[in-house]
Every structure is written in C-alpha cells, then in structure tokens.
Regions:
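Nucleotide-activated sugar donor-binding and catalytic core shared by glycosyltransferases
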Residues: 1-69, 75-209
Length: 209
C-alpha cells in the first residue's frame, strides 16, 4: 500500500502552532530575508579542511542574507577542537543558536529564503514547504525530493554552491512540486489499509489455519 509520508502528517497537524512561533522575533530576523543552515555529518565537520570549507560557504551565503545556524553539539565541539571559534565572532550576519525545538525550527524552515544542509528530514520538510534546499552530499535517502521536489544535491564546493545560490537569488532555481500523498492524511490511509487487510476473507482464513 502506498500511503504517503507520516512525517508530513506531523507537520500538517502542528502547522497552526508552528506559524504562531515567535522565533523570528526572538532572533530579530524577517521572513524570507535569512537562510537556514544545518550541518552535522562526520564527513562535513570531523576534519579541519572540511570546516574551513564550511566557513567559506558561510561567507558566501552572508553576502546576501543573514544566516541562521542552529548548531549541532558535534559541529560546535569540532569548531572548538580545531580552534575556529573566532571565525564565528567575525561574521556579524551569522546567527548561531543552540538546537531548537520542533515548532521553532519548522517556523524557520517555513520562512527562510533557502536552506543549506547535510541533514535528512529537512529535505522532505523543505520540499513540502516549497523552499529551495541545497543538500551538500553526493546522495540522499529521499530521492523524490530531488526528482520532483525543491531539493538539489550539490558537491561540497564553493564554486558549485555559489552557482546554485545565484540561481536562487535570481529566481532561476527549479520549481518543485509536493510529492503525491504528502497531504497530512497518510496515517488515515495506514489505518484504512490495516482495517481492509484485517477484514479480508483471505486473512481470516489464514488465521484459522
């Protein structure tokens, strides 16, 4: 049975509370005038050269936008370990926060100009919200977000990322669609499928054997 995406069910169910979040006021940012970043994978942050490249990308992004970066403990630990905390303080358009609660984070996804990430679930959430998402990875477990959604896989290269940022800023980025059945009703369809299966004659006869 094809039922949809239960993660989107959660997003739809809590959307009213998400939109009521005051995180934009707390961070003193305006809708569509900031970029959202998440970075935590070992391949990205566990070596000094990778972190240097990441800070170059941050400099690139903050030429045009403020950048909100809810930083993962792993990433912060590596920045401290490699003696790179000064690079954070030097960029006045970089807004570093602790990891945020679900409602606040989803509000940032909803209101950002675009996303730069190496994470997983945010690829689906951004596609549902129709927000451009640059995923700095070679592959993804969520291919439909690339095939028909707003997600793109981009090499961890300043030149490649700059090209895609320019496309977004110039409104030349691809126009994705929300995948079929991402409508907040997948849980209902799961229940209906289970009830149909449990009430079928073939299933009853199997249980009686």
């Amino acid at each position: 049975f094809l039922v949809g995406n239960t993660m989107i069910d959660t997003l739809v169910a809590f959307d009213k509370k998400i939109q009521q979040s005051n995180i934009l006021e707390t961070l003193k940012i305006k809708s569509k005038e900031f970029v959202l970043m998440t970075m935590h994978r070992p391949a990205t942050v566990d070596h000094k050269d990778g972190l240097k490249q990441l800070f170059s990308i941050i400099e690139l992004i903050t030429k045009n936008h403020q950048l909100v970066f809810p930083i993962h403990p792993r990433t912060l630990h590596r920045i401290e370990e490699f003696g790179m905390k000064s690079l954070i303080a030097e960029n006045r358009k970089l807004i570093l926060t602790e990891p945020l609660d679900y409602l606040a984070f989803q509000k940032l996804i909803s209101d950002c100009a675009y996303i730069v990430t190496d994470s997983g679930g945010i690829q689906e959430e951004s596609t549902f919200r129709q927000i451009p998402c640059l995923t700095l990875r070679a592959n993804t477990e969520r291919p439909c977000t690339v095939d028909i959604g707003t997600n793109e896989l981009v090499p961890f290269s300043q030149e490649k990322i700059s090209d895609r940022i320019d496309a977004i800023v110039q409104n030349k980025y691809k126009k994705g669609i929300i995948p079929p059945l991402w409508d907040g009703q997948s849980t209902k369809r799961i229940l209906e499928a289970c009830m149909k299966f449990l009430s079928s004659e073939s299933h009853v006869s199997t249980l009686l054997k």
